[in-house]
Amino acid sequence: MNRLLVGAAFVFCLAGVARCGGPVTGRIAVSSDGEGFVEQPSGARYVPFGTNYYDPHTGWAPKIWRQFDPNEVAKHFEIMSGLGVNCARIFLTAATFQPDANAVDETALKKLDALIAIARRSGVRLILTGPDHWEGVPAYWKPDRFAGEQALQALDRFWRTLGARYRGEPAIFAWDLLNEPHLPWFVETWRPAWGKWLQARYASRDALKAAWSGELAEQEDWGTVAPPLDKAERDNPRLLDWQLFREHLADQWVRRQVEAIRASDPTHLVTVGFIQWSYPLVRTGNPSLYAAFNPRRQSQWLDFVCMHFYPLLGRPFESQEAWDRNLAYLQTVLAYCHVGKPVVLGEYGWYGGGAPRNLPSLTEDEQARWIVAEIEASRQVTTGWLSWPFADTPDSTDMSKFGGLVRSDLTLK
């Protein structure tokens, strides 16, 4: 498979793309046409072409920071660089980097210092995600991770700390606020905000009644309007407004973090790793499965859009129809993300060389065919590709078990 990866990377290098291999020097900016990226100050075009990285032998979910081994990481980055990878996306974890809401852990930051130095030497730039749950869930995420003031203040502190520490660092391509954020359907503490949002939208109860008609009960007022049931119901105005309210909460979550980052680090790009059902094509029968993070809304605060995609409309190799349907789905999702800013396919891929849990066995050649098909199908609608994951992961419970660019023993597929 990696003959194809190396070939594609070689083509990018010949096409005037910022250097493949060698130490990282200049920072990356959005190009003047808003369609891609350039290296500063050279002006060379930069196409992020790489993978999502974690050490494949640190368990599942991977404990990349608790079991951090700089020698192993350096070996992995050397392999990636040799394959033509110029970008790696890496998760930061809340329980390791910020177990206490009031401070960011210095020991964890020193590990990140070491990883950034490795990346800089290898020529592989980094997309670093905001604090996630892989190594545990901190107490301050409760009761409300996305709209609770305690959790939001912790995020403010996290980004101000990292922004100040790594401002201007050329090895960092971008900050990714969070991997695949997804709002819950309802949190009890949202009730006052829901009432205020409705009042701002409709101004008077008469206007709300006119819009909702019989859906609004006589006893309901701004402070007592109930959220809808998590049940699909076409043309239900309460359900529509609730989804718009959830999007509003997601807007505020994105805006606040971006402002915290910009205050201490105006030098790096910012994005969000959107889950693919941020575009509500699948799972429409269950309203809560809509993530409420909408790239067409939240892109106003971001420098580029980062969308994730896996083949959910049937398995690609079960039929030509499933193959074609999934590629059309990919193109549709990416086209939806176009708002005048670059679009990166931040996770994609499939598996080969075995059979993950509950999935049929596929060969490495079949994995290669699908990855190449995804790249070819998306070339007109995206400007970067990061496969999932770097290496086959023995303890994985999903396609990551055989989804790597390399095998678990680090030999090339």
Report each predicted region and the residues it spans.
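Active-site mouth of glycoside hydrolases
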Residues: 27-302, 314, 352-355, 362, ...
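Substrate-binding surface in catalytic domains of secreted glycosidases
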Residues: 188-192, 313-332
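Active-site flanking residues adjacent to catalytic metal/cofactor-binding acidic residues
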Residues: 175, 179, 307, 346-347
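Boundary at the C-terminal end of the N-terminal hydrophobic targeting segment
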Residues: 18-20
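Bacterial N-terminal signal peptides
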Residues: 7-16
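Bacterial N-terminal signal peptides that target proteins for export
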Residues: 1-6
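Active-site neighborhood of phospho(di)ester-bond hydrolases with catalytic His/Asp-centered motifs
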Residues: 273, 344-347
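Surface-exposed substrate-engagement region within the catalytic domains
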Residues: 335, 360-379
